[in-house]
Amino acid sequence: ERTLQVLDYAVLVISGREGVQGHTVTLWKLLQKYEIPVFLFINKLDRDTADYEAVLKSLQERFSPAVCDMSFLTDSAGTDGGSVPEQLVMLAAEDHEEILEQYLDGTLNAAGMEESLRSMIRSGRLYPCMGGSAATGEGIDRFLQMFYRFAVTDYREEDPLRGIVYKVRHDSQGERLTFVTLTGGQISVKDSVDGEKVHQI
């Protein structure tokens, strides 16, 4: 649970065969508790009994109506394979009336919605979902392209060094290993760090 607190985004993987299970619900509640933006991937779609649509509907009913199928996206360059789903338009139009206007006059595409979608994902008002198979690789590249396209952070390398220590353990020789996620600046091998604080550098 401590590790979850340093995540910028999370990818929650759900089986396309078994659907939402007990551990899925537990993870979802923890992600909501720490207000972590979530991308969803429905896995095992290469199996005969897998059902993407059924699992997607279950996620919308059990987790949030803001879970939205993003399968119409095809690449990271703004070339999208289909029309923007009405569900996505309605969610985005709550904050941006111009999106609804563009949708009604037929000029709307995902490339024109990118900033709105990034903001919605980051604030937990949209949970993008795609499907595929980790075993065969089907859908993985498309999902990662979507993730890189819409997952953004504010960290800057030129800022003063700061970070959060989220785990400390010892290796087989008894040496202490400290796991840190940086939230600003940069650090290199053999750098010395001064001015430590509890849970922070």
Q: Model-derived features: where do they sit?
A:
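Structural and coupling elements of P-loop NTPases
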Residues: 1-201
